[in-house]
Amino acid sequence: MALLGKHCDIPTNGCGSERWNSTFARKDELINSLVSALDSMCSALSKLNTEVACVAVHNESVFVMGTEKGRVFLNTRKELQSDFLRFCRGPLWNDPEAGHPKKVQRCEGGGRSLPRSSLEQCSDVYLLQKMVEEVFDVLYSEAMGRATVVPLPYERLLREPGLLAVQGLPEGLAFRRPAEYDPKALMAILEHSHRIRFKLRRPPDDGGQDTKALVEMNGISLLPKGSRDCGLHGQASKVAPQDLTPTATPSSMANFLYSTSMPNHTIRELKQEVPTCPLTPSDLGMGWPVPEPHVPSTQDFSDCCGQTPAGPAGPLIQNVHASKRILFSIVHDKSEKWDPFIKEMEDINTLRECVQILFNSRYAEALGLDHMVPVPYRKIACDPEAVEIVGIPDKIPFKRPCTYGVPKLKRILEERHSIHFIIKRMFDERIFTGNKFTKDPMKLEPASPPEDTSTEVCRDSMLDLAGTAWSDMSSVSEDCGPGTSGEIAMLRPIKIEPEELDIIQVTVSDPSPTSEEMTDSLPGHLPSEDSGYGMEMPADKGPSEEPWSEERPAEESPGDVIRPLRKQVEMLFNTKYAKAIGTSEPVKVPYSKFLMHPEELFVLGLPEGISLRRPNCFGIAKLRKILEASNSIQFVIKRPELLTDGVKEPVLDTQERDSWDRLVDETPKRQGLQENYNTRLSRIDIANTLREQVQDLFNKKYGEALGIKYPVQVPYKRIKSNPGSVIIEGLPPGIPFRKPCTFGSQNLERILSVADKIKFTVTRPFQGLIPKPETKILTTGHEAGKTTRPRRLQQDTWQPDEDDANRLGEKVILREQVKELFNEKYGEALGLNRPVLVPYKLIRDSPDAVEVKGLPDDIPFRNPNTYDIHRLEKILKAREHVRMVIINQLQPFAEVCNDPKVPEEDDSNKLGKKVILREQVKELFNEKYGEALGLNRPVLVPYKLIRDSPDAVEVKGLPDDIPFRNPNTYDIHRLEKILKAREHVRMVIINQLQPFGDVCNNAKVPAKDNIPKRKRKRVSEGNSVSSSSSSSSSSSNPESVASTNQISLVVKSRGSELHPNSVWPLPLPRAGPSTAPGTGRHWALRGTQPTTEGQAHPLVLPTR
């Protein structure tokens, strides 16, 4: 069960457990039992698809119960719990509690209860102990009035307990070393650290004179969030007022230690609450006046990213994150004790904070400083020659930690001890003279007042830096307006030294030895990187002055540098591409086509390490390198047909380009939000295009693995939940298989570059292997000149049977598994330790030569290609009992050993290829059979009917040594031969095998073996009803040809294909509409060309 906030865990007075009596114990047990029963009822209701949300209040405790959705709802709506608690408490809400203490109510029963924050989330006891140790050190330092953290001398304080008084510890806990607490006690201390205060009774150097004094522990009532600051008036402190140190404020300590992820509405709520009920010394009942010495403010505790806390007394929420100092020790501890913690940590925010601390610390080391300095990411991106980053893992570009995912963050932390910054020289002076915001400098237009500019810049910064660390200090936050930093920054600050504000500008006179230039950063972070650090800040100006309203220097900003370079590279690419396709004017390069076909379309002469991408994706360094190598760049087009859609987009002509350049020169400073927004949109379009291409690639490869010619939607979730069922080969190193929407542009391009190598292999079937076919919409018209209307066809008109479609891939895989089983058993029967290909034809000719035992009773042994899916499943279930015994040798043993097709490796290599070829041959035969029937669509070939009547259909164009039969019986060599001769294959229908109406109304016209058993009866009944109705109609009405659903049809079959006009119905004039029920329109069909025997073959076509 989740208890509300943190006020529900501690009794209101500092009374020990000896004051509890049996009445309260029995009452608590009864409440726990009833709440557990209530939770069990919620669990039962959830199984009936009923959602329940329940809040129970008992004294100081709040129980949250219900189904999963109900508990999530209540835990996201904390105000509902608070309101209900206030309502139940009534006017006694703000009154001090003087009665018996209320025991903490925790519902241990009921497995669906939401656990309280922490033991499950922070299972590392060592980490908890270090966090509590940090809390005690900070409180002790504040009690001593020190600005830096002083380790707490546990031995001396425990030996002389009169030196220190501790207030606010949870009920029943005494002050001792953190290592002596159990995990629950450690979590209780961390959750209520904002109430704990240390007080020095005498200076530490006085000696242990008062050894009889005990460490004072005074329980403090923890009130709910809504009135926690207002409800402390009645709390009498047991400590002398003059003894309390003013610096030991719980709010500053909490802001100093912890990082929390608080939603925006919570932050705004706290901002509204705090001013209405400020926490003053008089409210606490402490008579000491407001101190004059400096009290650390929220600005003093700005972290390395310039964030400010949400409020001066913001509470700790349930999810307690590790303190920044613990994260600092994780980053800098040389031992391996933190490596398991890094590998198991999945919280992306904690990992990003660790990497942020790592980068800031290493950058400070490179500057020769002893405290963290924010890394100027955008400066490094715009001027990469100034700073070199050494030790970052391969294929991970240096950029903001907030842009990394969990795998890359872990890889960086694993190499944390080898990562270093090398300062080569000072940054470009033009970067130093830019403005403090992350966007390009914005010039004030004459009609734009400073207030509008401030609002626009603030909005611009919010759009670009939401969710990341702010790059400006507290003075910039004040200029941007109140509440901006708190609403955007979701993390509590880390403490830095106050003097760090004065070292923003860094000048390095003696650069270290140079090394190779670092890889230029990706475009994803260039327009949104930080340019606020390392800039000159006018220290002599007051906070009310707006630094961006003063005049700008004449030098160009980084945006002014990179934009012309991008335009020049864009023009260079367009010109070279136009030269390659043979046009005189520049033509826009179809970058996506070059990415999709890297072997047929590529570029030569690009600098080393630079591939063809849009110029917006390059930084300044790479753009300059491309321009330097402009004479050697050449576009190579091996297959011009791939560019048919891309050559129709000429770029602007010379006059338009000149006018555009003049327009840009006239307004060089109007870049701001709109331009960066357009740049961001272009990057989004590129990424979306790449994702669609990768999605299509995966769908195509998955369809090929299933033996289907059309792309099939990849079931990512089902593949993930069935590991090993689908094997994906050929992906670039370091890129796992997952949804394309989770990849960045760089990984998407890498995937597309190896598209030909990617291969899907389905090893075993699972539910949802193939998605269900969708119903198709067909537009039909019954008469010429009539308005066509859409109608929804029956699913089996154009698609295979639904069950077969769903299990098509499963049948193919099951068949191959049974083959492998038989090969394995045959090899064992021969005394070999490997599978041997079973000679099914020899066994069929000599059935007594091999005896197969262990098969299900109703299944004979034969080629697995002839089994249906049910028999295949039965055989696989009984695979442990299947055994072969060779009675008579069918083939020489040397031939078995030397057969190149026998080894398992050869079969496994050709398994996927054989499945694909087999399906392609099936599609070829279906297509040719449909053409022979005069239809413009494939029709399923009735192989069994043709086998029973081999003279009914003549197949021409097959290779000489290959007879026509079901493609399942062909080996891979014959399948390849048939596909090579596909242009010559042709079918001629000599004798009609089945009613033409069945062919037209059902795309699947298999033999009975291919029809599911549960549908055979329905099909046969339908045929009999149709036959009886037609016969009775023809006998009773002489004009039955015009009034029934069946019409005679004559089909030509003289060595040539049927023409559609000879078999498709033509409208007949009729005297009047038919009134017979169930009849449709009246059609007459004539095909008068005789067959080779001079006979006409009637067909039957039902009409609708």
From Swiss-Prot:
Residues 1021-1043 have a biased composition (Low complexity). GO terms for molecular function: DNA-binding transcription factor activity; DNA-binding transcription repressor activity, RNA polymerase II-specific; RNA polymerase II cis-regulatory region sequence-specific DNA binding. GO terms for cellular component: cytosol; nucleoplasm; nucleus. Residues 538-555 have a biased composition (Basic and acidic residues). It comes from the Eukaryota. There is a cross-link at residues 27, 184, 212, 225, 238, 271, 337, 436, 439, 443, 567, 579, 588, 622, 638, 669, 709, 717, 757, 759, 772, 841, 901 (Glycyl lysine isopeptide (Lys-Gly) (interchain with G-Cter in SUMO2)). GTF2I-like repeats lie at residues 119-213, 342-436, 556-650, 681-775, 805-899, 908-1002. A motif (Nuclear localization signal) lies at residues 1012-1019. The keyword Repeat applies. Widely expressed. May be a transcription regulator involved in cell-cycle progression and skeletal muscle differentiation. May repress GTF2I transcriptional functions, by preventing its nuclear residency, or by inhibiting its transcriptional activation. May contribute to slow-twitch fiber type specificity during myogenesis and in regenerating muscles. Binds troponin I slow-muscle fiber enhancer (USE B1). Binds specifically and with high affinity to the EFG sequences derived from the early enhancer of HOXC8. Interacts with the retinoblastoma protein (RB1) via its C-terminus. Belongs to the TFII-I family. This is General transcription factor II-I repeat domain-containing protein 1. It comes from Mus musculus (Mouse). The lineage of its organism: Eukaryota, Metazoa, Chordata, Craniata, Vertebrata. The gene is Gtf2ird1.
